[in-house]
Amino acid sequence: CRMSLCCCSAGSRRLLLSRLLLGQGRQARRPLLHLRTTATAAASSSATSLSTQQQRQVSLYVEALLDWNQRMNLTAVTDESEVMTRHVVDSLAVLPPLEHAYTSRGGDISGISLVDVGSGAGLPGLILAVARPSWKFTLLESMRKRCTFLEHAVEVMELSNVDVVCDRAESAGQSHDFRESFDVAAARAVAELKILAEYCLPLVRVGGLFIAAKGHDPHEEIRSAKAAVGKLGASMLDLCNVESMGPHGQRTAVLYLKERTTPKKYPRQPGTPSKTPL
C-alpha cells in the first residue's frame, strides 16, 4: 500500500476546500441556512460558500432529515448546527482529495458517475449532488424506509442528477446494470474497509476510484484490507487527511484505484462479506 498521507499538503487541502466552497473570484452570498450561534465558523463558511440555490437545497435537506428523523432512525445528530458541521461539511470535505486524485491522473471531472454505497441518510451522496450538479449520482441503500426518505429528499431538493436504488450492494455488484459501471464508489460510516471493499469495488469501472471516509486513524483497517483489495482488482492510491468538525477534529479519506476487472465470484452472496470478510 502506498500511504503518502495525502495527495496535497494541509495548506493546499484547505485552499482546495476553500475554493470548492467559496468559488474562485466569486463573492460569498448571504447564507439561507439560519445556523444557531453555536455553529462553528467552518460550518458558517461552508453555508455562505454555496450559491443561493445550493444553500436552499442544503437547507431543505437538513429540514427533511431532522423532520423524518423523529419517526425513523436516520442520524444520531439532532441539532441543526451539528448536522451542518458533522454531516454537510464532512461530506463536502471529501471532494478536494477525490477531484485531485481524478485530475492528477488525467481524468475529466465534468461528468463523473458516483455511487454512494450504503447511502443511509444520503451522506455523502445528496450533499455532493448539490455541490456537483454536472455529476450523476446513484444512492444505493438496502433498507426500504431509508430509500423512501431518500426519494423524498431528492424530490424536495429538486435534484435532477440523483437516482435512488433500493438494493443490497452484493446484489447490485452482480447486476449487469451496475457492475463495473461507475467512475467512483464512495462510502461513509458503513463498515470496515475489508468488508467495504467487497461492497464497492465490483461497482467501479477499471480505472475508476473507490473512496472511503474514515476516522482519524484508519491504519489498522488499511493493513487488514490490503489482501481483500488486491483480490478485488485494486490497490491503494492515497490516504488523505480531510478537514472535519468531528469529535477528533480530523477525518481521513482512503482512496483506491481499480486496476483490474473484479473476479466474477465477487461480491459474494448477500451477508457473506460481513460474516466472512476476505
Name the predicted role of every residue range.
Residues 6, 223-278:
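SAM/dcSAM-binding transferase cores
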Residues 142, 190, 213-217, 241:
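Short strand-turn motif at the edge of the Rossmann-like AdoMet-binding core
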Residues 4, 19-115, 145-162, 269-270:
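Class I SAM-dependent transferase core
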Residues 146-148, 218, 222:
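Short alpha-helix immediately C-terminal to the canonical SAM-binding loop
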Residues 92-191, 197-198:
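Conserved SAM/SAH cofactor-binding pocket of Class I
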